[in-house]
Amino acid sequence: MIGYLKGNVIWKAENKVILETGGVGYRVLVPSTVRLKPVGEKLELFVYTYVREDSLDLYGFKTMEERELFETLLSVSGIGPRAAINILSSLSYKKFIEAILTEKVSILKQVSGIGPKTAKRLILELKGKLKDMSGDFEEPLPDNRNTELSDALASLGYSELEIEEALSNADIKNNGSLEENIKKALGYLGSKGS
């Protein structure tokens, strides 16, 4: 099984990349949260190898935690690799785990193809499994401050997914000023683009 690839990008398209490693090109499917490097640059991916009777597919992730979450999602009845990639493309790692642990069906239903029944099944089957993966999540910002920050980032042209990812990963503090939190979010979003 292939678990990790590091190589040069020789071709890329939306949610797909071919990495050349040791003279071999590996076609890897990735969630939209993976920022693909330009052709010719190096890229590292943690890989899940999905084997079916008639094919072998590689799914790549920027962190081992995301790869493990993908594998955990596949354990849910009715969730295949396409649905799992769709979930990880729509919600950040932390946001998804928080939605499961806090049983927020409304957040899960925002993912295309996830209705109320599937959202409830995800919560039921994953809540116990994801407690170990949850880490120490800081309490989210109060709704009004979170909304102000989201609105500010949206006015700068960032997508809902980018905003959600920045809110989850940019070391934004409850006691920080709006200006400080905007700077941190922009710093995070800027570092992802490079």
Curated annotation (Swiss-Prot):
Q: Give me any GO biological process, just one.
A: DNA recombination
Looking up CDD domains in the UniProt record yields:
UBA_RuvA_C
Q: Where is this region: Domain I?
A: 1-62
Q: What does the comment on domains in this protein's record state?
A: Has three domains with a flexible linker between the domains II and III and assumes an 'L' shape. Domain III is highly mobile and contacts RuvB.
One GO CC term on file: Holliday junction resolvase complex
Pfam families the UniProt entry points to? HHH_5, RuvA_C, RuvA_N
| Gene3D superfamilies membership | 5' to 3' exonuclease, C-terminal subdomain, Nucleic acid-binding proteins
Give compartment(s): Cytoplasm
Keywords in alphabetical order: Cytoplasm, DNA damage, DNA recombination, DNA repair, DNA-binding
- Give the protein's recorded name: Holliday junction branch migration complex subunit RuvA
Region (Domain III) location? 141-194
Q: What is its main location?
A: cytoplasm
Cite the residue spans of the region called Flexible linker: 136-140
